[in-house]
């Protein structure tokens, strides 16, 4: 009996250590993924960009980071999280450096921003990696804590403009390259795949077909496109929105975007824990209904600090709860050997959900001079997905 307790305790310690490493790696790669958006005003003024071109610039890394999760998730099922975290971190160094030397060319920023999206694929590595370390009843907690690595976007929103202001664009990107190299080395040296994890052999395409045939994949993809897509869209476009709609300075907009991201990040593990206790469906319903309510408030273009500032924080909390709830649902509905591939597909849907809103918001603002229509559409989509969730998961 004592031996069994000791073994369980040791595994828990190892699980927590790997969870901490994975969360740190996720945060740093997400910071790299979000290097362009906090500097949108700088690029806009320096290169004389229209709102539509600025929106495209901040959205391109999101697109690649989203679609790239599909093959990366499948590769994680085959090679494991230790190998894939190390690989994603090291490969991301190249575009991080090249974006840092391309500030004078819109075309080169688009090109290297495209490849910077690779950093955003780390999400599809981490979910199966940490899920394998925990028993089913604790996977909501594990994926929620790992999801707190989304705080990398908060770090980027707050620190990137300050670092560029004090050190310059090139030095800031060079520091990020060093950080990516360091976290990749740490993952390779100290992380381990779970003892129960086994690589899935065979071609990746058949495994993707299997995942696509699962009803749970499509259901979770829809929910995540709204929850995580909303978070990504706000994280990438909020600096632009605050500087155009409320005339904040770039550093002030960055601080407020960081506050938004911190609220969402803090809410994600809460969503995971609540999912373990009251069920992921209820958590997702609360998320989507809350998003709808606060989007309506923002559509009225209220004063900047109150109620707009409070509404941005509350919508961040709502979206954060939803991101934790969706992957608790995935862990509940999908067998562990398929979680990596399914995570890649669901993560891609979430990222794509964050790709189109910045483009839409830029077009709406260019046409009307305000963002009302964009917030109305967010409210409508949120309530529609809430209705779908209540009907599709009645027995879950």
Locate the predicted segments by residue.
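Extracytoplasmic gate region of multi-pass secondary transporters
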Residues: 36-38, 216-269
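C-terminal transmembrane helical hairpin of 12-TM major facilitator-type secondary transporters
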Residues: 279-329
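Conserved MFS/SLC helix-loop-helix module at the cytosolic interface between two early adjacent transmembrane helices
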Residues: 67-104, 275
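A late C-terminal transmembrane helix in Major Facilitator Superfamily
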Residues: 333-370
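Helix-loop-helix hairpin linking two adjacent transmembrane segments in secondary transporters
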Residues: 145-191
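Flexible cytoplasmic inter-helical loops of multi-pass small-molecule transporters
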Residues: 189-210
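Cytoplasmic helix-loop-helix junction between adjacent transmembrane helices
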Residues: 112-149
């Amino acid at each position: 009996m004592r031996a069994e307790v000791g073994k369980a305790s040791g595994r828990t310690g190892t699980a927590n250590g790997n969870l901490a490493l994975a969360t740190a790696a996720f945060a740093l790669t997400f910071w790299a993924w979000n290097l362009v958006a906090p500097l949108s005003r700088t690029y806009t003024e320096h290169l004389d960009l229209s709102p539509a071109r600025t929106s495209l610039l901040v959205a391109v890394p999101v697109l690649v980071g989203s679609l790239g999760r599909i093959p990366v998730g499948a590769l994680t099922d085959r090679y494991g999280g230790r190998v894939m975290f190390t690989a994603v971190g090291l490969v991301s160094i190249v575009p991080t450096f090249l974006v840092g030397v391309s500030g004078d060319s819109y075309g080169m920023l688009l090109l290297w921003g495209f490849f910077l999206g690779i950093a955003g694929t780390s999400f599809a590595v981490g979910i199966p990696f940490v899920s394998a370390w925990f028993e089913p009843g604790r996977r909501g907690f594990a994926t929620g804590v790992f999801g707190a690595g989304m705080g990398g976007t908060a770090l980027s929103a707050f620190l990137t403009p300050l670092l560029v202001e004090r050190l310059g664009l090139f030095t800031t990107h060079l520091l990020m390259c060093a950080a990516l190299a360091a976290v990749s080395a740490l993952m390779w040296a100290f992380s381990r795949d779970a003892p129960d994890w086994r690589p899935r052999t065979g071609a990746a395409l058949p495994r993707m077909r299997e995942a696509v045939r699962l009803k749970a994949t499509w259901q979770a993809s829809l929910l995540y496109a709204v929850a995580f897509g909303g978070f990504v869209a706000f994280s990438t476009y909020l600096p632009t929105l605050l500087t155009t709609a409320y005339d904040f300075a770039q550093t002030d907009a960055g601080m407020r975007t960081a506050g938004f991201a911190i609220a969402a990040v803090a809410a994600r593990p809460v969503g995971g824990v609540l999912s373990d206790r009251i069920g992921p469906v209820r958590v997702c319903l609360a998320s989507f209904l809350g998003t709808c309510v606060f989007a309506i408030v923002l559509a009225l273009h209220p004063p900047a600090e109150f109620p707009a500032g409070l509404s941005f924080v509350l919508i961040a909390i709502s979206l954060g709860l939803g991101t934790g709830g969706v992957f608790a649902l995935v862990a509940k509905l999908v067998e562990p050997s398929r979680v990596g591939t399914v995570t890649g597909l669901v993560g891609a849907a979430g990222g794509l959900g964050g790709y189109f809103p910045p483009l839409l918001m830029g077009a709406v603002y260019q046409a009307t001079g305000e963002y009302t229509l964009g917030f109305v559409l967010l409210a409508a989509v949120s309530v529609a997905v809430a209705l779908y969730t209540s009907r599709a998961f009645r027995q879950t």
